[in-house]
């Protein structure tokens, strides 16, 4: 049987990126989209006063470290369907939702979308004035802590089975 990546697969990431570009109404670099994508799910890692929409799991920072291929595939999928545009300049490459992308995203509905949009708005409010460089530096200085609350989980499992 073929194993399929259900969580954080290309389609899910593409929808999340479209949600980010549609909600924030601004063109963003790949780096910023990657950062927003992570914090849209785990906002409490950026601001402990906020609630994350996904549960805290061990080693969740690995989803940030290992997502580059999936992000690029998701952007390629969105570009190929004219749901986003790419703005190229000498300084950067930025992506923005097209009218078609905005219309498609508007057709989606449900409680998860509401939570995701709320989380994206909060993340954008917290991060919009920060540079990509600042956010990258913040991530690399903090990511060791994200998921470390489960550091001794395996020790507890061993104790539970010793008798």
Each model region followed by its residue ranges:
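Exposed, interaction-prone assembly regions rather than primary DNA-binding/catalytic cores
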Residues: 110-163
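Short alpha-helix boundary/capping motifs
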Residues: 64-65, 106-107, 129
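Conserved, aromatic- and glycine-enriched, well-ordered alpha/beta core segments
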Residues: 5-93
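Accessory beta->alpha helical hairpin/"wing" motif in late/C-terminal subdomains of nucleic-acid enzymes
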Residues: 86-124
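Short, highly charged low-complexity linear segments
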Residues: 72-82, 92-103, 131-145
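Short, surface-exposed, charged/polar-biased interaction segments
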Residues: 38, 42, 54-57, 92, ...
């Amino acid at each position: 049987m073929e194993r399929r990546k259900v969580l954080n697969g290309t389609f899910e990431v593409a929808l999340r990126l479209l949600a980010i570009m549609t909600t924030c109404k601004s063109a963003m670099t790949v780096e910023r989209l990657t950062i927003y994508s992570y914090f849209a799910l785990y906002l409490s890692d950026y601001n402990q006063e906020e609630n994350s929409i996904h549960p805290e799991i061990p080693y969740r920072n690995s989803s940030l470290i290992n997502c580059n291929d999936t992000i690029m595939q998701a952007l390629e999928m969105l570009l190929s369907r004219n749901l986003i545009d790419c703005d190229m300049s000498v300084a950067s490459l930025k992506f923005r939702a097209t009218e078609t992308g905005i219309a498609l995203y508007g057709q989606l509905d449900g409680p998860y979308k509401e939570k995701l949009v709320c989380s994206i708005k909060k993340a954008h409010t917290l991060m919009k004035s920060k540079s990509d460089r600042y956010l990258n530096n913040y991530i690399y200085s903090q990511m060791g802590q994200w998921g470390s609350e489960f550091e001794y989980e395996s020790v507890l499992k061993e104790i539970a089975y010793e008798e």
